[in-house]
From Swiss-Prot:
Family membership: In the N-terminal section; belongs to the LPG synthetase family. In the C-terminal section; belongs to the class-II aminoacyl-tRNA synthetase family.
Domain of life: Bacteria
Gene name of the encoded protein: lysX
UniProt binding sites for Mg(2+) 1: 1084, 1091
Described function: Catalyzes the production of L-lysyl-tRNA(Lys)transfer and the transfer of a lysyl group from L-lysyl-tRNA(Lys) to membrane-bound phosphatidylglycerol (PG), which produces lysylphosphatidylglycerol (LPG), one of the components of the bacterial membrane with a positive net charge. LPG synthesis contributes to the resistance to cationic antimicrobial peptides (CAMPs) and likely protects M.tuberculosis against the CAMPs produced by competiting microorganisms (bacteriocins).
Binding site for Mg(2+) 2: 1091
Matches recorded under PANTHER family: LYSINE--TRNA LIGASE, CHLOROPLASTIC_MITOCHONDRIAL, LYSYL-TRNA SYNTHETASE
DNA-binding region: 726-804
MF terms (GO), sorted A to Z: ATP binding; DNA binding; lysine-tRNA ligase activity; magnesium ion binding; phosphatidylglycerol lysyltransferase activity; tRNA binding
Phylogenetic lineage: Bacteria, Bacillati, Actinomycetota, Actinomycetes, Mycobacteriales
Protein's name in the database: Lysylphosphatidylglycerol biosynthesis bifunctional protein LysX
Length: 1172
């Protein structure tokens, strides 16, 4: 599996930490055995990318500035650990150099002797002391408290020695100076260390001091014995009785005893060996002493159960989330229990595995807890495999994000083997199928135990490494009963022998993520491609919508370096990666994923200081199994003993000891999905209503009961006889409470009435109960009899009532309603609830639609429905909406007009046909345009466009009669008076015959100069320039005439007017005029600047129709998005002969606008609105 490294920084804010620890073993990874005779690279989810992280940084990296501090906070002594570490580190370095170089030893002889005598132990040649000082320096820098104690003890002891020497006296002036200076330095160092005590917070293991002493003693004894033996073999000039003491002095005495005490010397090379023996003993002891808290256990059953619960609740977007259940990881939870981070500690680096698991809103809490844990034990934090969202969370915690590669994601809905880009995969699949291979796909739960055992045996035997690899993208187990939802894909030969397998873990409920891949050495080339392809092609039957394949490290470098025109740096970087791919298969892994044309999703590393990247790289290599340390417990079974789940979550009793997932509904009930600082924030009025709802439920009242029909509407109740028994239902719009008597305004669709609740007339309860239980906007059912209030207002005298719908949000202003037009569009339901005008518009629109249908039905028209999804866009010149059908892997268009299908029906003999439905055009949005709209298209055989002049007028006048009660249109009017400006609507009579004018006559009148169909293009352009009408140079004369018409005629028209005889070139589906050259039999109906409809004498000549559509298709091929495409099926239908036909197209939305005097956004129930 690929590796993802990060080295985050540290944060502490005083909160508690829940964690458990683990040992360093792991079990399995996803890789594939490769044979020399096969070139099928397959998809290896091996740790090759992990090795590559040692090479450097990705060519596509993003470095982000830390937005906030990631440390405990800066005290005045925060510099003490670093200063102490650097000081000891310098001495360690010089000591090591002096031990191996006589020249260095001679150069530093004088200062070394002074430091050694008065300040700090600094022998001339002692590897042991050099390594011990180096470890001490590292521990001090890491803020280890035990290192602070060791250094402080050394300083105190040295100060005591110097004080004793000063008190004894008898020293030379130089010696007195050195002792006084040393004593002063020690006192200052002790004071500084004591003051900086709180800066050394990192803990070590319990009993570390005793373990370190035991390790050192054992190592020293072995070293002394070995050294004594060497001295006996090579004594040099040492006397026999001095050999044991000399060896002991060199091994464990740090050469502190004066060499002059010994009369002889052994061979020179032995001193270095003796120092190494001592170094080994001291290094072992120091490692044990300074080692941070280590993990002796891993996930417990409760931990794994909690993680699975979080995955069920929140894991649908994390392709690597299931790998958090790998059992050689430890886990730390957010205090809320709603998120956690799994990690593992290697060589002092705490490697977090991917994103936090759980609620995204609780991720910062989990990251804080993890960083506090790292800081507590002095670990260097690192993250492997963070997604973009996860990397952003780590960045907000003070880290830096670096993009290292990309994860390959297959979308089965888009996957296909056809096309030139899939040629390689297609050929590989063909070879595998020719070899007789078939693919079997099953869930692990459907596999028998004995068969699963065989599967595990095959996976082990086909592994090309001695141990399993993987950490961040490998589960580490196969066939575990807890992983019953995992998917097994097997390639089977004609003899029913399994030759290869894929195991994939769940990714939410609709995805799978590759865990393990194996293949037999006898498997034919193309086996892996066959399994992946079959999985993708049959994913729908398995309920799978996404497949995570692999991680390709440095993908961008390979891709960009191979591009034409790539720069020298990009080419050089790619060349280096190709070179290293000879060993680590970096390019092979990239290409084996790329051939499936996946979606590449970036994965990130995070770190605080670039200096620790090599250390984190080593830790990741160890975690992924590429570097196996001595005494490694990687292959051991891991079962934790100390749960890390927060007490709040453990106390629920929902977690299972066997690690199985808890009851998700139970987790929701205990508030795991809505707790600790990220609860739903609600306005105060809404919270009050929610509280009231809870009180009603606790009292046994169902605020949302099953409905029952009322006996009357409000309007019917108001018209009922006095004392008539009625029941009505509606929304409470107003409440007036007078103690024992309460008045409320009740509104339903038919109207509004007053209801009266009098304590003396209620069958149960009192008016106060109603007032306490209800709010404005609630839906109630009232039962009683009709009567009147004391003022004579008709009222329903209530005897009983029932709450049938609790309104949890307050209604808008009860007097003004919704005033903001945008708010009225976005919340049309509220607009209808409080505004009578909006309800009237809905009713008027319904009346218009009904009147149009009834008028056409009365004339013998048949209503039909034609496809909305069409393979070609035609029937009008407009920009279409494009969508995609996965089944056939092809683009489709939302229809811009139903014309071409309705004409097919005309060819089939349907003589009078219409469709009233939705059309879609990807054009502008304004007061008269909406991307989706209601369109009427009607076709009448043996008629022409003049026939439809009377037909269209009749349709609109009948619609106006149905909506307004008379053939009138409502027009906006503004009156200015002494009391200000007043806007209102006034009726305009639209009965009678409407004017009919030719297009060219209307333009001529507007220009004051005569034009006709024969007017040349040059003349028309000059007229445009004079009138200020824009045009394009590629337009012909017909298009220029149409532009003049739109600017000078259409927008200035008020009373409904028919403009007839448009230029032929702008009417591709219209019959040429029967007597006038250059124009077509077409009219447009315009009223108050808006086009309401158009009608044609339809073009029925298939030869001419083909010629015109071919011209349109050339325009489309030239880049015109509105030009129609060539519909060969339609043209073939026309060749069977269509009768002479008149066709009408009318925009119903605009007719409603005309009749109601409102904009299109007001007349549509739900017009398209931009998102918030």
């Amino acid at each position: 599996m690929g590796l993802h490294l990060t080295v985050p920084g540290l944060r502490r804010d005083g909160r508690g930490v829940q964690s458990n620890s683990h040992d360093t073993s792991s079990k399995t990874t996803a890789d594939i055995s490769r044979c020399p005779q096969h070139t099928d690279a397959g998809l290896q989810r091996a740790a090759t990318p992990g090795i590559s992280r040692l090479l450097g940084i990705s060519s596509r990296s993003v470095t982000l500035t830390k937005p906030r501090s990631a440390t405990r906070g800066n005290s005045r002594y925060h510099w003490v650990p670093a200063a102490a570490g650097w000081t000891v580190g310098v001495i360690a370095t010089l000591s090591l150099l002096a031990s191996v170089s006589p020249l260095i030893r001679w150069i530093i002889k004088v200062p070394r002797e002074f430091i050694n005598d008065y300040l700090f132990n600094f022998p001339d040649t002692n590897f042991a002391w050099s390594f011990v000082l180096a470890l001490l320096a590292a521990a001090l820098t890491a803020r280890k408290r035990i290192a602070w104690l060791v250094l402080l003890a050394n300083m105190v002891l040295a100060a005591v020695v110097n004080a004793a020497e000063i008190a004894a006296g008898g020293n030379t002036a130089a010696e007195s100076f050195g002792e006084n200076l040393g004593f002063a330095v020690h006192v200052v160092a002790i004071v500084v260390l004591v003051l900086g005590y709180r800066e050394f917070w990192a803990k070590v293991r319990r009993g570390a001091l005793f373990r370190a002493a035991a390790v050192w003693l054992a190592g020293a004894v072995v070293g002394i014995v070995a050294s004594w033996g060497l001295v006996e073999l090579f004594p040099g000039s040492l006397a026999p009785d001095e050999r044991l003491g000399y060896a002991a002095n060199r091994v464990v005495g740090f050469a502190l005893a004066d060499p002059d005490l010994f009369t002889g010397r052994p061979h020179v090379f032995l001193n270095a060996i003796f120092g190494l023996f001592g170094a080994f003993a001291l290094i072992g002891a120091a490692i044990v002493l300074f080692l941070s808290q280590r993990a002796d256990n891993a996930l417990t059953g409760e931990d794994e159960s909690a993680i699975r619960g979080l995955l069920d609740l929140y894991g649908k977007d994390d392709s690597l989330g299931y790998f958090a259940t790998r059992r050689d990881k430890s886990v730390v939870f957010a205090s809320s229990g709603r998120a956690c981070i799994t990690y593992r500690v290697e060589v002092g680096v705490c490697l977090a595995s991917g994103d936090p698991v759980g609620d995204h809103r609780a991720w910062p809490q989990a990251v804080d807890a993890w960083l506090r844990l790292c800081q507590t034990y002095g670990w260097a934090p690192g993250v492997m495999g963070a997604s973009s969202q996860g990397a952003q969370t780590y960045r907000e915690a003070g880290l830096t994000a670096l993009e290292l590669g990309d994860e390959a994601i297959l979308r089965p809905a888009d996957f296909k083997l056809s096309g030139p880009e899939m040629r390689g995969v297609r050929q590989a699949v063909t070879r595998a199928r020719r070899a007789g291979l078939t693919v079997r796909i099953r869930r692990h739960r459907d596999i028998a135990e004995d068969e699963m055992a065989q599967t595990i045996t095959r996976a082990d035997s086909w592994r090309d490494t001695e141990t399993e690899r993987g950490f961040s993208m490998a589960l580490g187990r196969l066939g575990d009963p807890a992983d019953s939802d995992c998917l097994l894909v097997e390639a089977i030969d004609p003899h029913n022998q399994v030759l290869a397998m894929l195991s994939l873990v769940p990714w939410g409920t609709t995805g799978v993520s590759l865990d393990l891949m194996r293949r037999s050495p006898q498997s034919p080339n193309g086996t892996i491609e066959l399994m992946v392809s079959e999985l993708a092609l049959h994913a729908e039957s398995l309920g799978i919508t996404r497949i995570s394949l692999n991680f390709a490290v440095f993908r961008a470098a390979f891709e960009q370096g191979a591009q034409l025109g790539a720069g020298p740096v990009a080419r050089l970087w790619r060349g280096l990666l190709v070179f290293f791919s000879r060993w680590w298969q970096l390019e092979t892994l990239y290409r084996s994923n790329m051939k499936y044309q996946p979606e590449w999703v970036p994965r990130y590393a995070c770190y605080e200081d670039a200096r620790v990247i090599p250390r984190v790289g080593v830790a990741s290599v160890i975690a992924e199994g590429f570097l196996v340390l001595p005494f490694s417990r990687r292959n051991r079974v891991h079962t934790g003993h100390h749960p890390a789940v927060p007490e709040r979550l453990a106390a629920t009793g929902l977690l299972h000891h066997d690690g199985s997932a808890p009851d998700v509904s139970g987790l929701r009930q205990v508030g795991l999905t809505n707790g600790d600082g990220v609860e739903r924030r609600l306005p105060e009025q809404v919270r009050v209503r929610f509280d009231k709802l809870e009180k009603l439920r606790s009292s046994g009242i169902d605020a949302f009961p099953v409905g029952r029909p009322p006996s009357h509407t409000v309007a019917q109740a108001l018209a009922a006889d006095h004392q008539a028994s009625v029941s009505v239902s509606g929304r409470i719009m107003r409440i007036r409470n007078y103690g024992g008597v309460l008045f409320a305004q009740l509104r339903d669709w038919s109207g509004e009435m007053q209801v009266l609740l009098d304590n003396s007339r209620l069958d149960q309860g009192c008016a106060a109960d109603f007032n306490a239980a209800t709010d404005l906007g609630d839906l109630v059912e009232m039962t009683g009899h009709m009567g009147a209030s004391k003022t004579g207002t008709p009222s329903l005298i209530v005897s009983g009532w029932r709450l049938i719908g609790k309104c949890l949000r307050p209604l808008p202003n009860k007097w003004k309603g919704l005033l903001d037009p945008e708010a009225r569009v976005r919340t049309r339901y509220l607009d209808l609830a409080v505004n009578a005008e909006s309800r009237a518009l809905i009713t008027a629109r319904s009346s218009v639609l009904r009147a149009v249908r009834e008028t056409l039905f009365a004339k013998g028209f048949v209503e039909v429905e034609t496809p909305i999804l069409q393979q070609l866009h035609g029937g009008a010149t407009a920009r279409p909406f494009v969508t995609h059908i996965n089944t056939y892997s092809m683009d489709l268009f939302l229809r811009i007009a139903p014309e071409l299908y309705l004409k097919r029906l005309c060819v089939g003999g349907v003589e009078r046909v219409f469709e009233l439905g939705r059309a879609f055009r990807n054009e502008g949005v304004d007061f008269s345009h909406n991307p989706e709209f209601t369109l009427l298209e009607a076709y009448q055989a043996h008629a022409d466009y003049l026939e439809w002049i009377d037909g269209c007028r009749e349709l609109i006048q009948n619609a106006a009669q149905a909506a307004n009660g008379a053939p009138i249109a409502m027009r906006p009017r503004t009156d200015k008076g002494s009391d200000g400006t007043r806007h209102h609507l006034e009726p305009v009579d639209i009965s009678g015959i409407w004017p009919v004018r030719t297009v060219h006559d209307a333009i001529s009148e507007a220009l004051g100069e005569r034009i006709d169909a024969d007017t040349g293009l040059t003349t028309l352009r000059k007229l445009c320039d004079a009138a200020g009408v824009p045009y394009r140079t590629q337009w012909d004369a017909g298009a220029v005439v149409l532009e003049l018409y739109e600017h000078l005629v259409e927008c200035r028209t008020e009373q409904p007017t028919f403009y007839i005889d448009f230029p032929t070139s702008v009417s591709p589906l219209t019959r040429p005029h029967r007597s006038k050259r250059g124009v077509a039999e077409r009219w447009d109906l315009v009223a108050w600047g808006i086009e309401l409809g158009t009608a044609y004498s339809e073009l029925t000549d298939p030869v001419e129709q083909r010629r015109r559509l071919q011209e349109q298709s050339l325009l489309a091929a030239g880049g015109d998005p509105e030009a129609m495409e060539l519909d060969e099926d339609f043209l073939q239908a026309m060749e069977y002969a269509m009768p002479p036909t008149g066709g009408l197209g009318m925009g119903i939305d605009r007719v409603v606008m005309l009749i109601t005097g409102r904009s299109i956004r007001e007349t549509l129930p739900f017009p398209l609105a931009k998102p918030h």
